[in-house]
């Protein structure tokens, strides 16, 4: 029986490349001179440090630009509020969301069931397996999921006949 998996996985090598590019831009930009702006990774968190709340927000925007250029969705990142630190520093905590949480998985299953397609969806630890009798039904299910505006970035893998 044909099937495929729906997952939400972050490519950490692309994130590292985007961090390097953003760090380079932050070190070269005039408005960040003397502001000690930097980006650090502590999986599953990313920290952005700078002197001043506005500089932290600007550094986050630079990082977002670099992520989008490398085709990494910003839906993986949840930014907190800039927190003041010692000596006028500020830091911003970015929480990385990988996998499909239970709420979004149920929304996808409901979306598939409401579409009246002859496919079944099963939730399995951060991913979904969708099975059907015909390959065409599975392709329609993929199109249906892509058309929905979900708050998570999805990939479709392991398409099997």
Language-model region placement:
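A structural signal for short hydrophobic beta-strand segments in well-ordered beta-sheet cores
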Residues: 38-39, 121
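N-terminal, positively charged regions that mediate nucleic acid binding
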Residues: 1-27, 31-34
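Short glycine/threonine-rich beta-strand-turn micro-motifs
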Residues: 42-53, 124-134
């Amino acid at each position: 029986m044909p099937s495929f998996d729906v997952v939400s996985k972050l490519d950490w090598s692309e994130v590292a490349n985007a961090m390097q590019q953003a760090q380079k831009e932050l070190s070269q930009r005039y408005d960040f001179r003397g502001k000690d702006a930097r980006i650090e990774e502590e999986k599953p968190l990313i920290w952005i440090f700078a002197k001043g709340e506005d500089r932290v927000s600007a550094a986050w925007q630079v990082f977002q630009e670099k992520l989008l250029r490398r085709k990494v969705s910003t839906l993986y990142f949840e930014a907190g509020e800039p927190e003041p630190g010692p000596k006028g520093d500020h830091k911003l905590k970015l929480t990385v969301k990988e996998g499909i949480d239970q709420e979004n998985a149920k929304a996808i299953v409901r979306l598939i069931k409401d579409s009246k397609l002859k496919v079944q969806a099963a939730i399995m630890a951060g991913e979904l397996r969708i099975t059907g009798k015909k390959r065409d039904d599975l392709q329609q299910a993929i199109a249906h999921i892509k058309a929905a505006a979900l708050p998570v970035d999805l990939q479709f893998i392991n398409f099997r006949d």
